[in-house]
Amino acid sequence: MKTAVIDNDKIIVKNVDDIKLNGRKGAIVKVIGCGLCGSDIVKFVHKIARNGTVLGHEIVAEIFDINSAASFKKGDVIVTSHHIPCGECVYCKHGNVSMCEHFKSTNIRPGGFSEYVYLSEEHLQNVAHLKPENLTDEEASFYEPLGCIVRAVKRANLIKGDKALVVGLGSIGILTAQALRAYGCDVMGCDLLAERIELTKSFGIDACDVRELPDEYEADGIFMTSGADKAISTALKYVRNGGKIIVFSSTPSDLSAYPNNEIYYRELTVMGSYSPSPVDLNDSLALLKEGKVKVRGISTEYKLDDIQKAFDDTMSNKIMKAYIKL
């Protein structure tokens, strides 16, 4: 089978032995397509992932072989996520599922940039779902990233009618804005790139150049979906006293100045949000199926053989998001 692996400073496609169940519980699935996540790029660029690693976790796939108590059968087209919480540890009991050690240890191997992958019984029972018939394969690949966003929106715990500002209108920012709207917020998005602002508007979300936001604008919640260093200063400028800042991106390096006094005197709440629980994923799929979050036009399709170009085009901002079709 063909698979894309990290080879020093590039991603190469090579042929490897087919994978088989060999009596294991779970399923072998034939990958239809897999979205390229920002975390895949971070792992590649900063050499977090080793040579030989197969990245990719935003998977849409067809069940090829199965030995499972789950209700799926051969030929079913499914979406899945890659991490599963234990539900029993101190982190899970406090709702911090992405800090769970079991959550961190579970993954899809090889990753989704491969013709076939193995899904454990645990994956099938907890985070896999039939693909809704009204979604294309490419649209369904947003199941996992939108799950991350649903978690961030829930953690903010804003109430209906609250004002929310999304700082950074890449694919995650645009999805975040739509999810916030679906949860009843009054949403504004901002960015520096005109094409991203216009794309956001095409989804019915108010958006503007960040430099054109009125000084008097105030939001109950700020969602930092950009990793730019200036995003934190934008968040501090426009969050109301007593408001919330949701950090939903990584930065190239730690910020040099921690805004301690602003947080202290203004009673701000600053929180991070990382990865979804199975419940968040259920809600994500419902938002996609019901059309409350639309994704068509956000991603650009590439073949597996062109995966290096997909990485390069994403990193150079030629495209917003890549979808690798196998």
Model-assigned labels for residue ranges:
Residues 21-34, 47-90, 130-134:
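Glycine-rich beta-strand-centered segment in the early N-terminal region that forms part
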Residues 3, 278-326:
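C-terminal hydrophobic helical "lid"/dimerization subdomain
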Residues 229-290, 326:
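Glycine-rich phosphate-binding loop and adjacent beta-alpha segment
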Residues 214-222:
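A short acidic, Gly/Pro-enriched loop at the edge of an enzyme's catalytic core
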Residues 86-167:
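NAD(P)H dinucleotide-binding glycine-rich loop of Rossmann-like/cofactor-binding domains
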Residues 5-21, 36-64, 79-80, 97-108:
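N-terminal glycine-rich cofactor-binding segment
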Residues 75, 135-211:
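Mid-domain Rossmann-like dinucleotide-binding core that forms the NAD(H)/NADP(H) cofactor-binding site
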